[in-house]
Amino acid sequence: MPSISTDFDVRPYEDVPAQTIALSVPDAAAPKHCPIQLLFWPVDGKSSFTRGYENLKEGLSRLLSDVPVLAGKLERGWKGDSRYLAVNISSDASVEFVYEDVSAEDIIPSYDNLAQNGFPTTGFRDILSPKMSLGPMVEGSPMMCAKLNMIKGGAILAYGFSHVLADGWANSELGRLWALHAAQVSQGIEFKKHKDATPDEDIRRRLSTLPEYDTDVPLDAFLQITPSEEATNFLHKDVLSAEKAKKKAREKMMATLLAAGEVPELPRFTFWRFTPEKLKELKQAAAGSDPDKWISTMDALAGLFWSRIALIQGQSSNGHQQSRCIFALDIRRRLQPPVPLGYIGNVFSPVDALCPLDELESDSLGLKAAAQSMRQANKGWAQSRWEAWLNKIMSLPLDQTLDTSQEFRLQKHNMYFNDYSAFQLNTASWGAPFGQPTRTRCLRSGLSGGAAGVWVCPKLPDGSLEVWLTSTAALQKSLFEDTMFNHYAEFVCQHT
């Protein structure tokens, strides 16, 4: 049986010079967290697990040479200004990639048990996750973290890239590159770089240049000016100050929910599966017969959740007239001039779709109205809107920044929608002995009340989509009983 290395520090495959990389303003404005992906594989015996770990480890070493910024640590940039962050790469830079045998942990089911139950993650997030991901992101935090866990009959890879460095698209691209390098290690192929060559320094400088601003373009209504240190995207100096700020924000949120008559509870995560046939049927139902009202499958999927949740909650009876659905657009190809798809960074724009609640709550009109609202919001995006956001961030005093309005986040008639369907996590092979993951899961936190969140997972090999919803127990129960919703959706699993 091959032995497994106990040196968890992974260094770049080729020497990387010490350097400091200035990030862009959109990078600095990104959420300060490291979203963790879980990849599940069946594994036959410790020997296969050991071989898989060593392949992933050398694949990671190659990735660090391909994308050196991943080996760095986050720091304040120009004159300590929180709008300008940087990544410092030392001459001995490395990334920690831990493995752990957790097969004896009673709380963690066997691989077969997880597969039979839809791969829920209740109760063992802290055991599986890299330690770095369990605390707040602060000055000195690494740009990525990873851990491989051996369970009974399988393996679970938990890894994440700092959102400060990578938005959703870039996160997917980094995962694809790691998988490609690991696969080539398993095949005995010599190292070569696979990341597309991009003028990163020029792009970051462009994204940090104060744009010409059309003063007639208003800021999005879901944004608000916030004291910098109270914003959700503020980079704190240390864990203690970050935890204090988090506690203060949570207390404020709980007080707001209680004042609105809501009882805060532990958020629930429910996974639903949509087959290619049901997605096609859903799109046809949401589009109707008017050829001028074309919608995408994703518009229809968002419309289903948005309309059925609105109908169940019936918030128009409480005096609310409109609902907002916020989603993020990757604008690499929409900006003029475009940003190359291979660029690693944050190039997204938050967008909100608006729909009257009386239309959303209509059993016959809700799906079509919601889907059309999503389509119009997508089509209506303009570069001037993004430039207004960037201009405002760069023009505010140092002690102020832009953040998502807490009022929006805590209003239950609103919704978040996140589309990760184009990501290749479920279809990329990581080489022998692991191969293609059976399933992926993303570990995220949820609100104790307020707006529901919907996440579309990476497409499965058969074309199906899994979608997860953060919601209250009451909303979850109502969706189980909703005939129209269950006509399209198949329950997969749930966890807290």
Curated annotation (Swiss-Prot):
The active site is at residue 163. Keywords: Acyltransferase, Transferase. Its EC number is 2.3.1.-. Gene3D superfamilies: Chloramphenicol acetyltransferase-like domain. The keyword Acyltransferase applies. Disulfide bonds: none annotated. Pathway: Secondary metabolite biosynthesis. It is an enzyme of class 2 (transferase). InterPro entries: CAT-like_dom_sf, Plant_Fungal_Acyltransferase. GO terms for molecular function: acyltransferase activity, transferring groups other than amino-acyl groups. Acyltransferase; part of the gene cluster that mediates the biosynthesis of squalestatin S1 (SQS1, also known as zaragozic acid A), a heavily oxidized fungal polyketide that offers potent cholesterol lowering activity by targeting squalene synthase (SS). SQS1 is composed of a 2,8-dioxobicyclic[3.2.1]octane-3,4,5-tricarboxyclic acid core that is connected to two lipophilic polyketide arms. Belongs to the plant acyltransferase family. Monomer. This is Acyltransferase clz6. It comes from Cochliobolus lunatus (Filamentous fungus). The gene is clz6.
